[in-house]
Amino acid sequence: MTTSIIERIDAWAEKTPDFPCYEYAGTRLSYKELKRQSDAFGSFLLKNLNTDKEKPIIVYGHMSPLMLVAFLGSIKSGRAYVPVDVSMPVERIEQIKKAADPSLFICTEELPSNLTITGCPVLTQDQLMDALEKHFGEVPDKEACVKNDDNYYIIYTSGSTGNPKGVQISQNNLVSFSNWILQDFSLSQGLRFLNQAPFSFDLSVMDLYPSLLSGGTLVPLDKTITANMKDLYREIPAQNLDVWVSTPSFADLCLLDDNFNQENNPGLIRFLFCGEVLAKKTASELLNRFPDAVIYNTYGPTEATVAVTQVKVTREVIDAYPSLPLGVIKPDMRLHIVDQETGEVLPEGEKGEIVLIGASVSKGYLNEPEKTDQVFFDYKGYQAYRTGDSGIIKDGYLFFQGRLDFQIKLHGYRIELEDIENNLKKVSYIQNCAIIPKMKDEKVDMLVAQVIPTNHDFEKEYQLSAAIKNELKEFMPAYMIPRKWIYKTEFPLTMNGKIDRKALNSEVNK
């Protein structure tokens, strides 16, 4: 059982010093090097950063080994880290920086030319490398390290106002998650873990920490590879993976390649899915292609540390239910299905809101007490979270029944539809809009924007769409930009004067 994340990771530097903790595209980082570099960086931070330890450190970059060094160095200095991926638009990065109020902004990659960080010190990649060299051999005071209920990481998710909100995950939260996943998912020493998700997406925690805590190797597939199908299909078998961690959508992409099978990936015997609905046909095809593999379906919001339920997806499970179960709750957690209006706990078989209680639940949103109080509460001395997800329990399994609000999952990313709408309304060509999810195989397939445009001079609708998307890309991530655009002169309204979203949904999902 792990009680300290850092102590257990550092222990591998003694047990297997030369074993790679990270390996990709010719770049290799051993456990000994990870400890030495994170020690050096932790020492640098303790000597040079005199601000309040409650203020986190933003770590900007993609999937380089320097990200791991910066994460662990921050923890060793007693400060939580906020991962920010290079794929984020400048405006989003600025929003996160403003909301997090960090003590330091670390760059493991070069910042975009149109982004200027003000209000806190910035450490460039060159300065980071210089700090690692100058403080090489130094070991930070263990007492300074993040511990117990201290924040360990803060991940920013989509917020309904158009501004992201930072979910605080403590050392205790992460210890609870890590112990569960290492034991219940039978993850032994020295395995090679796929890292598909960027570190700013909490699905990455499902591969990063189980890998480091079990003396395994993290094998990232960065955005240059995943953006090119041929490169992706060539790279996967070359990585000799043992453990697959991804969204179901990424697996669907890989299943388009006939060579994605057990014969070409003989070590790949565990699949862990989280972040969105796992369709039965995806699970079934994986079992066809990888007959010796074990497939786990999991569920959990960022606010409950990645995942809190799991089920082994077998042929029997696939055949027994109309949709796949999300599984059973982890041992140190409780799960209630409650009436959304009254809060009354409902019996098995009745649909209601999923409420999570226990060791995995976050303390709330950073610097957002009002938003925290809206969804987090104390339940008999335990931290609890109203997920906004609708669920039902059958045969002891949790089943997902959709969102109670306008929040959806698309390709593993949690998105507030209101967030997209608020951003669309900033565009000069848009008077009003509504975002409708197009459903396919029990999950969101794409986002459809229904738009009332302002007066414009474009002759063709595709020209208008291109102009809108060109504006949007300046302040909204690519995964949030709708794929289909429908233009209207007016929206149907409900009796109380609101946009009739049911009518719009019926048009999109005929």
Swiss-Prot record:
Ligand binding (ATP): 157-158, 297-302, 389, 498
Amino acids binding D-alanine:
202, 306, 498
Keyword tags:
ATP-binding, Cytoplasm, Ligase, Nucleotide-binding
Coiled-coil positions are none
Q: Superkingdom of this entry's organism? A: Bacteria
Gene Ontology molecular function, alphabetical? ATP binding; D-alanine [D-alanyl carrier protein] ligase activity
Recorded GO cellular component terms are: cytoplasm
Q: Which NCBIfam families match?
A: AA-adenyl-dom, D-ala-DACP-lig, PRK04813.1
Which family is this sequence assigned to? Belongs to the ATP-dependent AMP-binding enzyme family. DltA subfamily.
Question: What is the protein's given name?
Answer: D-alanine--D-alanyl carrier protein ligase
Identify the taxonomic lineage of the organism of origin.
Bacteria, Bacillati, Bacillota, Bacilli, Bacillales
